[in-house]
Amino acid sequence: MVSEKTMAERVLALMGRPNNIRNIGIIAHIHHGKTTLTDNLLAGAGMLSEELAGDAMFTWWHEQEREREMTIYGAAVSMVHEYEGDDYLINLIDTPGHVEFGGEVTRAVRAIDGAVVVVDFVDGIMPQTETVLKQALREYVKPVLFINKVDRAIKELQLPPNKIMERLAEIVVGVNDLIERYAPEEFKDKWKVSVQNGTVAFGSALHNWALSVPYMQKTGIGFKQIAEIYNTAADAKEIRRRVWEIAPLYRVVLDMVVRHLPSPKEAQKYRVPKLWHGDLNSKYGKAMLEADPNGPAVAVVTKVIVDKTSKQETAIARVWSGTIRRGMEVWLLNANKKVRLQQVGVFKGIQKIQIEEAKAGNIIAISGVRDLQSGETIVEPEPDGSKPNIPPFEAIKHIFDPVVTKAIEPKDPRDLPKLIEVLKLIQKEDPTLKVEIDQESGQILISGLGDLHLEIVEYRIKNDFKVDIITSNPIVVYRESVKGQAGPVEGKSPNKLNKFYITVEKMPDELYWKLREKLLKGELPEGKIKKMNEDIIKHLMSLGFTREEAQRCKVIYRENMFFDMTRGIIHIGEVIDMVMDAFMQVMDHGPIAWEPCIGLIVKLTDAQLHEDAIHRGPGQVIPAVREAIKLAMKDAGLVLYEPVQVILVDVPPDYIGDVTALINSRRGAILDIQTEEDRALIKAKVPVREMIGFTDTLRSATSGRGVWYLVDQVYEPVPRELFDQIVREIRQRKGLPLDADIV
């Protein structure tokens, strides 16, 4: 192993050479070998002994990860690789493959410019491969491909070389189909991977070898020599030693990374315009486009880690321009406050090496600041110390919404303040976790992406932060909407001196999906539109709205839209903000069961306002608009939607009957069944309400041999025969009237 001092010195020397930096992530489906690959890359860079690689799981910094044998939290590590006589700094982030931790992938891809996509030779492309690659491409991250577990083809499946080549070609075609589908238009062809040009490598992370065409051409080492070692070696240890000598994995993969993935200098030219919507001709825009270390400092936090004993927070951040220095004062644009950066460091796995400064293009660790959140933009103050007038980077978007909620309380009521503090800390680390305190009942609700997500949060509260808790059974989050359209419906203020006229209609499905995609890409803002501009108008018109409608769009909230279509109403400008607040309140709590609304277009078409401002304050305007929206929704035909998960179940063929019966017993529908010799893939749709406890039931139905993966999440109307029962359950739980209308 290289001594820490030597490694630290080499890292520091390279931090000022942006052309020699590669910020990369390893992304893949769960259990396809990402973390083992990471360990072997570290061993090759001299940061982990070769004997330990693969067993050490260097980036698994949380005991939950070791127990479950999967990466939950994206860890960061810096290492040095020599290529063609020059040193390169590789900043690497290991990301989870389990879909319930997809938020970690979303945040990690903001920090990186390139990704090594790992695909299992036997499994091929799986649902999460598609999800994580889609997330990376959406953030303008360039991929290369590593096909792992080729050792299984030789030892286990005993495939002849021509069959192995056929399978490799199949995987390459599949990955390129995904790149064609999800890559930005200008990179659809440029970013396709190819065995010939060296953007594809294949090998075994377990046995620590890899091959690529450039490596084979350079060394004369080929598949034949590897197969020979497998056929003659006495045991796995001998295989590892001998293949390492002729085709070391780290050299082949990191050579591919250096040669084919972009430096920050190159990547920021096309990434900054997509991720930051400020003036590219300003001093900030120019500095970020060039990754200029002498420009004003701008960095973005992509993750916050909380130490379970000291509660100290460490933020992982990408420096986009300028130089971040220890002890410097900076502005946090989202939090709107000035703070001092106490410590700056780089990661060596879990360990931090303290440094004095970090220049543009680097991934760093910042400690000693309590107000950093994932997605925060850090900016150097203006020369007079004031806050720069620039927008923050666009918010980091997550593909799936939280759909499962639990009520949580401390066993000992005296631990309540501690529990609230712990939840705030965990939420900083994991923004996909939603924490709400019901203002009326005082009940604390935590919402996550599924059963497993909440289980891990509970484990951390109990074991890391030592708070004993009681949790309720999981509760599913529903959505409210309408069947058709209605209005204008009148809403009167309590003093009867103001009237508002509202129409409500269901968003057409095609429009809804296009809107969702634009929100995920950051092309449209979420919330009140503070400043309408030509870009927003164009994106709204591309959804099918007229120019006039687009100009009058005031709010996009929870995938619902609000338009002010009034003309010539005196004083409307003074109350429109309250009208928007009322709209957002109803979108948070709909009329059926106080669940959030989805897919609605709400328009204010007319209003009659009292001339005296004292008679049209929030206490008059907000109830009137709320009433009008809820009555219009009722007239348009109320619908309750439930979250439905599209899943893929992977089982031996003998269990197809048991699994289809299990899915059918949970109101599921089979969409597709594909069978191979030793496995069957069953694609199905199952309501989230019925998915609770599914993992354990599947395990017992298949003698522990069945696993399932989340492919997608959609909302579908609750069946008519269950509507009354579900509404009653929700209302009862929330302490709402069981039969009366909630308006």
Curated annotation (Swiss-Prot):
- Name the keywords, alphabetized: Cytoplasm, Elongation factor, GTP-binding, Nucleotide-binding, Protein biosynthesis
- Name where it mostly resides: cytoplasm
What are the subcellular locations of this protein? Cytoplasm
Among SMART domains, the record links this protein to:
EFG_C, EFG_IV
Kindly give the Pfam families that the UniProt entry links to this protein.
EFG_C, EFG_III, EFG_IV, GTP_EFTU, GTP_EFTU_D2
Name the residues that bind GTP.
28-35, 94-98, 148-151
Q: Read off the SUPFAM superfamilies from this record.
A: EF-G C-terminal domain-like, P-loop containing nucleoside triphosphate hydrolases, Ribosomal protein S5 domain 2-like, Translation proteins
The UniProt entry, under InterPro entries, shows: EFG_II, EFG_III/V, EFG_V-like, EFTu-like_2, P-loop_NTPase, Ribosomal_Su5_D2-typ_SF, Ribsml_uS5_D2-typ_fold_subgr, Small_GTP-bd
Q: Which residues form the tr-type G domain?
A: 19-265
Q: Name one GO cellular component term.
A: cytosol
Q: Where Diphthamide occurs along the chain?
A: H615
Q: Name one GO molecular function term.
A: translation elongation factor activity
So what family is this one in?
Belongs to the TRAFAC class translation factor GTPase superfamily. Classic translation factor GTPase family. EF-G/EF-2 subfamily.
**Function comment:** Catalyzes the GTP-dependent ribosomal translocation step during translation elongation. During this step, the ribosome changes from the pre-translocational (PRE) to the post-translocational (POST) state as the newly formed A-site-bound peptidyl-tRNA and P-site-bound deacylated tRNA move to the P and E sites, respectively. Catalyzes the coordinated movement of the two tRNA molecules, the mRNA and conformational changes in the ribosome.
Q: What is this protein called?
A: Elongation factor 2
From which organism does this entry originate? Nanoarchaeum equitans (strain Kin4-M)
